[in-house]
Structure formats: structure tokens, C-alpha cells
Amino acid sequence: MPNYYDELEIEDFAWDPVARVFHYPCPCGDRFEISKGQLRDGEEIAICPSCSLIVRVIYDYLDWEDYVTTDDEDDGGSVDTPLSNTSPDPAYPVVVGSAEVESQSKTASSAVSSQKEECTSLSDRLAGLQVESGKEDDPVQEHKREDSSDVLH
């Protein structure tokens, strides 16, 4: 009987559509991996290719009976994985289409511009309070003037 490093549920693993494996971070910095084919065959050991650690994967074999495709047939584009509440590991990003990236870029840029507007509004409010209190020669005011001159260029 092998000596397992840990026991993990399949729901804790993330799906890598490029390598077509479920993966989970390993303490060595690499990742434990197990394929759908291994799960269909009843295997329950995920191996880290960089070190000697193995984990036992806990899953309900009956949930995996529905997978009638082989790993080679999965190249057709559809990935039939169970729903999971886990998100992919940020160390292994998933490539998305250019339209999605462009959309995300526009969303991020609009968020930045709204933050700039909010900062400007707060700076204006602070400047007004400083004028009321008699502290007009303040570094915040000078910084604000420098920023506004940068915007004009």
C-alpha cells in the first residue's frame, strides 16, 4: 500500500484543458496531476512529476461512468468535466480568446478611469477643506497642480 502525502477531493483540483489533466499544487512548486482516463479506469493516485509525492484522489466512481470519450477524443474541443466551485490555479493561466481579453482590457481601463475621477474628486474636496482652514500652501495642492499639468501634455 502506498504512503500518501494527502487525500484530496477531485473538486479541489482544477482542469487544465491544454494538458487535459486535473491538477493541484504540490509543495515542491510543481503540481499533482491525474487524467480523466485514469479516473475512468478507477485509479485514485495523482502524481507530482517533479518529486516523489503522491496524493489519493477522492471521488465517486459512479460520477465518472458518464465519460464515454477517451482522452484522445477530447481533442474535439469539448471538455466534459463535472461542475466545480474551484477556480483555476493562477500559476497556470487558461488562454482565452482575443475578444474576451479585449473585453477584459476595456473593463479594466474603465475601472481605472473611474478611480482617477474619484481621486480627482477627493483631491478637490481636500483642497476646498484646506482653503477653508487656511492651509492653502499644502503639498497635496502642489501635487495636484503637477498632475493636472501632466494630463495636459
Swiss-Prot record:
Keyword presence, Transcription regulation: no
GO biological processes: protein histidyl modification to diphthamide; tRNA wobble base 5-methoxycarbonylmethyl-2-thiouridinylation
UniProt KW keywords: Cytoplasm, Iron, Metal-binding, Nucleus, Oxidoreductase
Binding-site residues, Fe cation: C26, C28, C48, C51
Domain of life (superkingdom): Eukaryota
Positions with biased composition (Low complexity): 104-114
Obligatory cofactor(s): Fe(2+)
Reaction(s) catalysed (UniProt annotation): [3Fe-4S](1+)-[protein] + Fe(2+)-[Dph3] = [3Fe-4S](0)-[protein] + Fe(3+)-[Dph3]; 2 [3Fe-4S](0)-[protein] + 2 Fe(2+)-[Dph3] + NADH = 2 [4Fe-4S](1+)-[protein] + 2 [Dph3] + NAD(+) + H(+)
Keyword Ribosomal protein: no
Stored InterPro entries: DPH3/4-like, DPH_MB_dom, DPH_MB_sf
Cellular compartments per GO CC: cytoplasm; nucleus
Biased composition (Basic and acidic residues): 133-153
DPH-type MB domain span: 4-60
Cellular location(s): Cytoplasm; Nucleus
Family as reported in the entry's similarity comment: Belongs to the DPH3 family.
Domain notes from UniProt: The DPH-type metal-binding (MB) domain can also bind zinc. However, iron is the physiological binding partner as zinc binding impairs the protein electron donor function.
Its job: Required for the first step of diphthamide biosynthesis, a post-translational modification of histidine which occurs in elongation factor 2. DPH1 and DPH2 transfer a 3-amino-3-carboxypropyl (ACP) group from S-adenosyl-L-methionine (SAM) to a histidine residue, the reaction is assisted by a reduction system comprising KTI11/DPH3 and a NADH-dependent reductase, predominantly CBR1. Acts as an electron donor to reduce the Fe-S cluster in DPH1-DPH2 keeping the [4Fe-4S] clusters in the active and reduced state.
Oligomer and partners: Component of the 2-(3-amino-3-carboxypropyl)histidine synthase complex composed of DPH1, DPH2, DPH3 and a NADH-dependent reductase, predominantly CBR1.
UniProt name for this protein: Diphthamide biosynthesis protein 3
Originating species: Cryptococcus neoformans var. neoformans serotype D (strain JEC21 / ATCC MYA-565) (Filobasidiella neoformans)
Lineage: Eukaryota, Fungi, Dikarya, Basidiomycota, Agaricomycotina
Underlying gene: DPH3
